[in-house]
Amino acid sequence: MKALSILGSTGSIGLSTLDVVRQHPGKFTITGLAEGHDVGLLNEQINEFRPDVVSVRDAASADQLRKLLGTHKPEIFYGIEGAATVAAAEGAEMVVSAIVGAAGLVPTVSAIKAGKHIALANKETLVVAGQLVSDLVKKHNVQLLPVDSEHSAIFQSLAGHRTEDIERIILTASGGPFRKTPAEELKLAGPEQALKHPQWTMGAKITIDSATLMNKGLEVIEAHWLFNMPAEKIGVVVHPQSIIHSMVEYIDGCVMAQMGVPDMRAPIAYALAWPERCGTGIGKLDLAKIGTLTFEEPDMERFPALRLAFDALKAGRTYPAVLNAANEIAVAAFLDKKIGFTDIADTVDKTMQAHEAYAPVELDEYLQADRWAREKAREIIG
């Protein structure tokens, strides 16, 4: 029986994780849950999974939850500190890090320092503080297992192979809802259109990131840290069917790819059960029915966010943290209809150009860059 704590339990990844857990009552148990937006749903999860500790967004949410609780009464915390407490709490062997954005960094670091294995869905943890997190993973001798479908695919395709035999890794991208949209029309695109992802069902922020291709850019940076690959050995190809989740090309010209229907329960289950596998309840892949798999080069002129991410990775230092923070602010402004679709990447670009980068060492130095970029992006948006 593997004990889990889930950070972001009421979000898309959290719900899919609990669905996998629900299918394997003799394999997994829940010791901690943390959420930020839906106290009512968290209460339902508490009644079903009976965790020892939980965390909510703020003190008011904690008071609301106390009034809702039934017979099972876990210890309640709140805020980032509360999520960090749940992440480090005794009992859990693995922590599923699925809080959206840079807010997931501090709790994930707390979990690593407490010796927990990490199932990482929060790519921003590595984007913002990849060097720090990588060093801590080694220091505390924990496993960092990818939950993103692309990185799970690479992880599986690397099994049994030497790093020196890798020519490059290739991340696949669906292309998002605007794959064929002319540049002049992108300026007029609103949140309603951008939120219509052609393949995946995800939260609002990551869906917008997929539309701008910033999500793929963040995944490039994540792949760099997960697999110790330089930017020059990380490629991106648009694959609209989202059947091949990513590939590894070896020095002999052979390419290993992981395929499957687009359902996040598959990579989640792989991370939870690793080094074993477990059932997911998802549909079987029928290649004959699909018929055709197609591939295209990404258009970095129409989607400059991907280029900005490569630039940030190559420049290093605090640039990836600034890229991520500015993007979070810009996406929120777009969802609130304060800026246009193409203004998202423009805001990130201007924030990066204004930044005087430095080499961070301590966690607070990474967070300082994050805070600066948020303020600067808000100033640019006006």
From Swiss-Prot:
Pfam families: DXP_redisom_C (PF08436), DXP_reductoisom (PF02670), DXPR_C (PF13288). Gene3D superfamilies: 1.10.1740.10, NAD(P)-binding Rossmann-like Domain (3.40.50.720). It comes from Chlorobium limicola (strain DSM 245 / NBRC 103803 / 6330). This is 1-deoxy-D-xylulose 5-phosphate reductoisomerase. Pathway: Isoprenoid biosynthesis; isopentenyl diphosphate biosynthesis via DXP pathway; isopentenyl diphosphate from 1-deoxy-D-xylulose 5-phosphate: step 1/6. Mn(2+) binds at residues 148, 150, 219. The gene is dxr. Its EC number is 1.1.1.267. SUPFAM superfamilies: 1-deoxy-D-xylulose-5-phosphate reductoisomerase, C-terminal domain, Glyceraldehyde-3-phosphate dehydrogenase-like, C-terminal domain, NAD(P)-binding Rossmann-fold domains. Catalyzes the NADPH-dependent rearrangement and reduction of 1-deoxy-D-xylulose-5-phosphate (DXP) to 2-C-methyl-D-erythritol 4-phosphate (MEP).
